[in-house]
Design a protein with these regions (language model features):
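Flexible, solvent-exposed loop/hinge segments and secondary-structure transition points
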Residues: 2-188
């Protein structure tokens, strides 16, 4: 009798818990299997929309499989040969800043958007506002200076020089990526 009580009080609850865990794990795995392709497609559409925002003339994008410039995380070629959309990173005040930069087939910046940063809201993030980015970088075809303070063509945000420089360096990396592609046969 004592053995039967031990089984009912200790083993049965443990077995029930194991069965519940197996059922929940199977349900979670099934849900992940069903949702994973949908999530991947949504992420691709979101990324393509961001690429289209920085390179409006681009019509569809294909991942560039060649060599990437330093600081470039990924590069996509516009399917119609109108340019590239580059995601680049650089150290900023609060951590790593990530920006997406569009460069047209003439080597000019068509758009910049900051896609990730850890800078303090307020002054530092002014260097990431759409008006600042468009006014300073659209049409830029060269960013050869060592930092933003040495480039007369681009204005830094006073008090946010580190954040401004991080954006500048991301644009510089994107333009370097364009030059790499042009040096290896061009966009087509």
């Amino acid at each position: 009798m004592k053995n039967n009580t031990f089984f009912k009080e200790n083993i049965v609850p443990a077995l029930v818990l194991v069965i519940i865990c197996l059922v929940v794990t199977a349900a979670l795995a099934f849900t992940y299997g069903v949702a994973s392709p949908i999530i991947a497609e949504n992420e691709k559409q979101t990324a393509d929309a961001a690429r289209a925002q920085v390179l409006p003339a681009g019509d569809g994008f294909t991942l560039y499989e060649g060599e990437l410039a330093e600081g470039v995380a990924e590069c996509y070629l516009a399917d119609n040969g109108e340019g590239i959309a580059v995601t680049s990173t650089y150290g900023s005040f609060g951590g790593t800043l990530t920006a997406m930069v569009g460069v047209d087939k003439e080597g000019k910046v068509t758009g910049v958007t900051v896609t990730g940063h850890a800078d303090t809201p307020g002054l530092g993030t002014k260097a990431m506002e759409a008006d600042y980015l468009a006014g300073n970088y659209t049409g830029l075809d060269s960013a050869a200076a060592g930092s933003i303070k040495d480039d007369a063509n681009v204005d830094a945000i006073t008090g946010a020089t580190i954040s401004s420089n991080a954006v500048y360096q991301c644009v510089k990396e994107a333009l370097a990526q364009y030059e790499n592609i042009e040096g290896n046969g061009g966009l087509n």
